[in-house]
C-alpha cells in the first residue's frame, strides 16, 4: 500500500511559532514519526510539503496517475478559501483523510477540504496521523 502524506502551507513553521496551539514538535519530527509508524504498519509513505497551492495540487494529481492507494492531507493554511485544492481532492481516485494537529474547529469554521475528504482526524497531534494511517489502511483492506 502506497500513501501520500501532504503537509500544507505553514507546516514548516510547526515547533517555531504558535507553540501554544500546535506544540513544539517540528515538521521534520512529525515526518520522522509518520515514517516510523508507517513502516510498522508495512505502508509505503511518501511525504510532500509545499507552501504553494499549485504544487500540492500537482502532487495529488501525480499520485493519482501513479496509482497511490490514498492520501493523508494536513491542509494547514490551505484549510479555507482554496477551491482549486478542494476540487483536486474531490477528483483523485483514492480516498483522502484530512489530518490536523490541533482542533481547527475551536478557532473557526470547518475546513473546505474536509467536505470532500473520506474522514477527518483533529486535535491529537502526531497520533492523528497514526489514526489516519490505520483508518486508511483498514478502509482499503475492507475491515
Say what each PLM segment does.
Residues 6-9:
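Short hydrophobic segments within beta-strands
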Residues 58-67:
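Short, well-structured alpha-helical segments in soluble
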Residues 14-29:
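Glycine- and acidic-residue-enriched helix-capping/strand-helix junction motifs
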Amino acid at each position: 500500500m502506497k500513501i501520500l502524506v501532504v503537509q500544507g502551507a505553514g507546516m514548516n513553521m510547526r515547533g517555531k511559532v504558535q507553540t501554544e496551539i500546535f506544540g513544539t514538535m517540528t515538521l521534520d519530527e512529525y515526518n520522522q514519526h509518520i515514517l516510523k509508524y508507517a513502516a510498522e504498519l508495512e505502508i509505503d509513505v511518501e511525504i510532500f510539503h509545499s507552501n504553494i497551492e499549485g504544487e500540492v495540487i500537482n502532487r495529488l494529481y501525480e499520485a493519482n496517475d501513479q496509482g497511490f492507494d490514498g492520501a493523508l492531507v494536513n491542509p494547514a493554511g490551505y484549510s479555507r478559501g482554496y477551491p482549486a485544492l478542494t476540487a483536486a481532492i474531490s477528483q483523485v481516485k483514492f480516498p483522502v483523510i484530512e489530518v490536523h494537529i490541533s482542533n481547527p474547529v475551536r478557532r473557526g469554521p470547518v475546513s473546505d477540504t474536509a467536505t470532500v475528504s473520506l474522514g477527518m482526524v483533529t486535535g491529537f497531534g502526531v497520533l492523528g496521523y497514526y489514526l489516519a494511517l490505520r483508518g486508511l489502511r483498514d478502509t482499503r483492506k475492507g475491515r
